[in-house]
């Protein structure tokens, strides 16, 4: 990364290894007022308490924020006028949350701050705890109960569902989950190396997968229940550079400095290439047969056009809050409509 600073030591610009430039502008209080990525600006406004009051993106869509006297976020107003609201008690705990897209949810707490009940519409779920604050019972809206039991270290060792089915859990000395036993007698188990990496998993049917790691705890091989081995090698940045399957077929991968996949080459030499915009958005995929898929975006990164080859394309449109409203292709147009709460209705 290359950084440029002003006389106050604030970052003015940042250039990543791919050449993407992010520039910063500040207000009189030293707060970031503008962030520009390759010419696309996002604006920030603040209230008197230095809370973010509004964010306007490169498509001129503004989201506004409001807070109570304690600095708790109480309201988010979206570009279409819909809003999320949140109410708090004197201790700053959420007691009522009303999203723009659904029913309000109310919360009740005990003296220790544990949630005692969650109410959404007419549905109430209740919770009970032991003296250590661990959940021991959940009573669902239909009155059914799920109970929980713990060992002295606080590990969950038992769970009983509303039908009375018991699931038991056991652990290693390091409190790593070692075995799960179900009500029907079936079980799953795990084994670990000294570093805590899973080296074996046995499922309820008795099938065991084994895992191998290198000195820096990167997975280097997976051996399935039939003995088939898949091996992994990594580059200097810990990206998977090579995968060798059980038939010794090798697939190789390369990446740019930001970790974006650049090429994928299979055992037959067929190569798929990937290219990205300066912002890191996928710009094109070139397949082994020469077919090129391209992607176009708006200033905020919403996908506008997918050119899928043979002159065919898929175009997408969005509303003022970034939800897709229309997808068009040679096969026709799909229109998406939302209700007042933001739910997709058609």
Task: Give residue ranges: language-model regions.
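Beta-strand elements of repeat-based all-beta scaffolds
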Residues: 1-16, 20-57, 61-78, 82-99, ...
């Amino acid at each position: 990364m290359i950084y440029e600073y002003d006389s106050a030591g604030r970052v003015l610009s940042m250039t990543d290894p791919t050449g993407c430039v992010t520039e910063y502008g500040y207000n009189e209080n030293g707060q970031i007022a503008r962030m520009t990525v390759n010419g696309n600006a996002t604006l920030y406004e603040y209230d008197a308490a230095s809370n973010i009051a509004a964010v306007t993106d490169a498509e001129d869509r503004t989201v506004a924020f409001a807070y109570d006297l304690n600095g708790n976020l109480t309201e988010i107003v979206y570009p279409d006028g819909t809003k999320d609201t949140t109410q708090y008690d004197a201790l700053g705990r959420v007691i009522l949350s009303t999203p723009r897209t659904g029913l309000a949810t109310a919360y009740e707490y005990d003296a220790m701050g544990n949630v005692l009940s969650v109410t959404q519409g007419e549905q109430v779920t209740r919770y009970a705890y032991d003296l250590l604050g661990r959940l021991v019972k959940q009573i669902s809206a239909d009155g059914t109960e799920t109970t929980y039991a713990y060992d002295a270290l606080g590990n969950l060792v038992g769970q009983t569902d509303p039908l009375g089915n018991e699931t038991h859990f056991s652990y290693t000395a390091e409190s790593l989950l070692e075995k799960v036993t179900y009500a029907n007698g079936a079980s799953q188990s795990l084994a670990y190396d000294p570093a805590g990496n899973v080296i074996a998993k046995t499922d309820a049917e008795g099938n065991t997968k084994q895992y191998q790691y290198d000195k820096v705890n990167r997975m280097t091989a997976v051996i399935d229940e039939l003995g088939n081995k898949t091996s992994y090698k990594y580059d200097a940045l810990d990206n998977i550079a090579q995968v060798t399957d059980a038939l010794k077929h090798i697939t190789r991968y390369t990446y740019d400095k930001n970790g974006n996949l650049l090429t994928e080459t299979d055992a037959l030499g067929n190569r798929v290439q990937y290219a990205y915009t300066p912002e890191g958005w996928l710009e094109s995929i070139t397949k082994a047969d020469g077919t090129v898929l391209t992607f176009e975006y708006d200033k905020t990164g919403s996908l506008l056009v997918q050119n899928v080859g043979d002159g065919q394309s898929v175009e997408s449109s969005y509303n003022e809050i970034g939800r897709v409203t229309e997808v068009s292709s040679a096969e026709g147009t799909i229109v998406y409509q939302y209700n007042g709460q933001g739910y997709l209705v058609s």
